[in-house]
């Protein structure tokens, strides 16, 4: 995918300034991602630090729009100035495609890292945004669970692989397949935050129950406690009575995890993914783009606060 261009209004929104604050010598009709990065440096407009988050998008139920959501979320974080690594865990390579690339064009995937001990840095690819990198996936990833089975410490392979590169990134986003196996167990063990995209239907409850049981078992058996679990209602249509009833049920049974932001049903969102473009490139003014931005606005203060607490604890322990 070619690098997008942005208007002065869009650039000002990303930088958190008014268009008039953009230096006159830097003003132009269309800005590239590199132009924006230079402006960030000139104006010193970098976002609040998040403390190297590792965030997993996962639901054991398929068809929830998870990949469209995770890739557009990662893209938008990068537009806002965060250094982001998107890791495609699904052998179908949909996250790779949503960034405008074909998985088959890449020789190496995460399989090479987890099984063949290839350094993760050698598998990471550059996207059309200077601060968004990705790890591609293709059908070779379909054998990763089987290959991990006989290995010692198999559930920690991904966490260990990240150690050499995660300091370069504010956020690592994992896009996982809708299944439970060793690869997704690795992702859960590596993650700080879990995003669970759901549709407003009662079938989603079955997947949620199993997922939360899995999270609880990780806490009890492997002593891994997630910092945050965010349930995100995706593709919501308020004209459907059943959708409203399902949303009310989610609010009743999972109030502490359910994000107040709802991603409304948006044709342009789905179309953008099929075209291999994040919704913020295809139509930044669409309902899908606005709702994902609202979701980010909702969770960022929590993540910034968590990073500040962690930094304080680290300083106290060092002292």
From Swiss-Prot:
<dbReference type="GO" id="GO:0051301">
    <property type="term" value="P:cell division"/>
</dbReference>
<keyword id="KW-0132">Cell division</keyword>
<dbReference type="Pfam" id="PF13614">
    <property type="entry name" value="AAA_31"/>
</dbReference>
<keyword id="KW-0067">ATP-binding</keyword>
<keyword id="KW-0547">Nucleotide-binding</keyword>
<dbReference type="InterPro" id="IPR025669">
    <property type="entry name" value="AAA_dom"/>
</dbReference>
<feature type="binding site">
    <location>
        <begin position="61"/>
        <end position="68"/>
    </location>
    <ligand>
        <name>ATP</name>
    </ligand>
</feature>
<dbReference type="GO" id="GO:0005737">
    <property type="term" value="C:cytoplasm"/>
</dbReference>
<comment type="function">
    <text>Spatial regulator of cell division that is involved in identifying the incipient division site, recruiting FtsZ to the division site and stabilizing the Z-ring. Binds ATP and GTP.</text>
</comment>
<dbReference type="InterPro" id="IPR027417">
    <property type="entry name" value="P-loop_NTPase"/>
</dbReference>
<comment type="subunit">
    <text>Interacts with FtsZ in pull-down experiments.</text>
</comment>
<dbReference type="InterPro" id="IPR050678">
    <property type="entry name" value="DNA_Partitioning_ATPase"/>
</dbReference>
<keyword id="KW-0963">Cytoplasm</keyword>
<comment type="similarity">
    <text>Belongs to the ParA family.</text>
</comment>
<keyword id="KW-0131">Cell cycle</keyword>
<protein>
    <recommendedName>
        <fullName>Cell division protein PomZ</fullName>
    </recommendedName>
</protein>
<dbReference type="GO" id="GO:0005524">
    <property type="term" value="F:ATP binding"/>
</dbReference>
């Amino acid at each position: 995918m070619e690098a997008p261009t942005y208007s002065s209004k869009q650039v000002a929104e990303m930088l958190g300034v008014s268009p008039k604050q953009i230096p006159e010598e830097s003003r132009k009709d269309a800005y590239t991602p590199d132009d924006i990065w230079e402006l960030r440096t000139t104006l010193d407009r970098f976002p609040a630090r998040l403390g190297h988050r590792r965030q997993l998008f996962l639901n054991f139920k398929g068809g929830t729009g998870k990949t469209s959501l995770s890739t557009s979320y990662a893209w938008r974080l990068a537009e806002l100035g965060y250094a982001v690594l998107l890791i495609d865990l699904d052998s179908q390579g949909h996250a790779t495609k949503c960034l405008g690339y074909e998985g088959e064009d890449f020789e190496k995937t995460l399989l090479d890292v987890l099984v063949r001990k290839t350094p993760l840095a050698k598998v990471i690819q550059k996207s059309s945004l200077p601060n968004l990198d990705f790890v591609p996936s293709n059908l070779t990833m379909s054998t990763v669970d089987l290959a991990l089975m006989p290995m010692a410490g198999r559930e920690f392979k991904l966490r260990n692989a990240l150690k050499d590169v995660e300091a370069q990134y504010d956020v690592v986003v994992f896009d996982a397949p809708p299944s439970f196996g060793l690869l997704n167990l690795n992702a859960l063990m590596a993650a700080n935050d879990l995003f669970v995209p759901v549709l407003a239907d009662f079938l989603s409850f079955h997947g949620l129950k199993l997922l939360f049981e899995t999270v609880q078992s990780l806490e009890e058996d492997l002593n891994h406690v997630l910092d945050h679990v965010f349930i995100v209602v995706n593709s919501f249509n308020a004209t459907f009575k059943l959708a409203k009833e399902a949303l009310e049920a989610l609010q009743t049974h999972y109030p502490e995890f359910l994000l107040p932001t709802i991603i409304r049903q948006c044709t342009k969102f789905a179309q953008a993914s099929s075209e291999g473009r994040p919704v913020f490139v295809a139509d930044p003014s669409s309902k899908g783009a606005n709702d994902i931005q609202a979701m980010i606005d909702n969770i960022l203060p929590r993540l910034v606060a968590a990073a500040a607490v962690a930094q304080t604890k680290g300083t106290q322990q060092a002292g």
